[in-house]
């Protein structure tokens, strides 16, 4: 069983065991009317938009430094991030909905709930905890699930980042007319990363969509490798969590977009 299949099976068990219903019952609803739109930010921003991530660990990384997360988010906003991603998976990524709830009030930036969503109930919990965006991973959803979850999230006034890893998944994302598409440079089945994967997937991209390159971006040289693919932004986690000088590092990544 791949790590991804294992994670999805775990999410299914949480749904069956009432985990998400319990979260709905115990989490206070967070009002986030002051959140900005990430899509609006992308459309207005001549430079790459940055989704800066809060993460504690992953199936491949266990040595991320502990940070004052409120300060981390404050620094993300101060030094040019356009959105914040917060992992809410507890078992594999060390996150939680409680963390999302606590941190979303620390910023006016859009906040992405990054998790493995397979059911509308998870979207309800994400919204109640204060997310303004959710992630949908094409690889773990049928076409019907993808369409239904996408439409449900939009109906809840949430923005949706649809994540793809190959060209077939990109075509599936186009079918739901996704405005925001993330290209994951990490193969979630093997957890192997190649930042230039973005170039391959976006060779025949369609216009009128916004593209985010995710995973494997460690410095400005990585960004330059994929800049001419026509990306609109980057999702960066590990490099930012390891960085001790965000005031210099974050602005270096916000390069001028190159539109082909």
From Swiss-Prot:
The family database entries (PROSITE patterns) matched by this protein are listed as: IGPS
Reactions listed under catalytic activity:
1-(2-carboxyphenylamino)-1-deoxy-D-ribulose 5-phosphate + H(+) = (1S,2R)-1-C-(indol-3-yl)glycerol 3-phosphate + CO2 + H2O
The cross-references to Gene3D superfamilies, in alphabetical order and at most eight, read:
Aldolase class I (3.20.20.70)
Supply the alphabetized keyword list: Amino-acid biosynthesis, Aromatic amino acid biosynthesis, Decarboxylase, Lyase, Tryptophan biosynthesis
Q: Name one Pfam family in it.
A: IGPS
InterPro entries, alphabetically? Aldolase_TIM, Indole-3-glycerol_P_synth, Indole-3-glycerol_P_synth_dom, Indole-3-GlycerolPSynthase_CS, RibuloseP-bd_barrel
Span-the-membrane segments of this chain are none
Instruction: Name the pathway it acts in.
Output: Amino-acid biosynthesis; L-tryptophan biosynthesis; L-tryptophan from chorismate: step 4/5
> What superkingdom heads the lineage?
Bacteria
Q: Which GO terms describe its biological process?
A: L-tryptophan biosynthetic process
Enzyme Commission designation: 4.1.1.48
Record GO terms (molecular function): indole-3-glycerol-phosphate synthase activity; phosphoribosylanthranilate isomerase activity
The family this protein is said to belong to: Belongs to the TrpC family.
Against PANTHER family, the record matches this protein to: INDOLE-3-GLYCEROL-PHOSPHATE SYNTHASE (PTHR22854:SF2), TRYPTOPHAN BIOSYNTHESIS PROTEIN (PTHR22854)
Read off the NCBIfam families from this record.
PRK00278.1-3
- Tell me the protein's name: Indole-3-glycerol phosphate synthase
């Amino acid at each position: 069983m791949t790590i991804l299949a294992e994670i999805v099976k775990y999410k299914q068990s949480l749904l069956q065991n009432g985990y998400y219903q319990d979260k709905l019952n115990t989490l206070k609803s967070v009002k986030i009317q002051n959140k900005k739109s990430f899509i609006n930010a992308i459309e207005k921003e001549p430079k790459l938009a940055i989704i800066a991530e809060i993460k504690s660990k992953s199936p491949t990384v266990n040595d991320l430094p502990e940070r004052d997360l409120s300060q981390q988010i404050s620094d993300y906003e101060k030094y040019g991030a356009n959105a914040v991603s917060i992992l809410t998976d507890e078992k594999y990524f060390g996150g939680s909905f409680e963390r999302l709830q606590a941190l979303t009030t620390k910023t006016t930036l859009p906040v992405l709930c990054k998790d493995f969503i397979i059911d509308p109930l998870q979207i309800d919990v994400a919204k109640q905890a204060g997310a303004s965006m959710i992630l949908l991973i094409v690889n773990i959803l049928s076409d019907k699930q993808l369409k239904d979850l996408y439409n449900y999230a939009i109906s809840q006034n949430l923005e949706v980042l649809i994540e793809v890893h190959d060209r077939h998944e990109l075509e599936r994302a186009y079918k739901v007319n996704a405005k925001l598409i993330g290209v994951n440079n990490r193969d979630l089945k093997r957890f192997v990363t190649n930042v230039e994967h973005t170039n391959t997937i976006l060779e025949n991209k369609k216009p009128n969509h916004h593209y985010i390159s995710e995973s494997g971006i460690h410095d400005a040289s990585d960004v330059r490798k994929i800049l001419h693919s026509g990306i609109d932004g980057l999702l960066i986690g590990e490099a930012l969590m390891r960085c001790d000088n965000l005031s210099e590092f974050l602005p270096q990544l916000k390069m001028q977009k190159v539109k082909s």
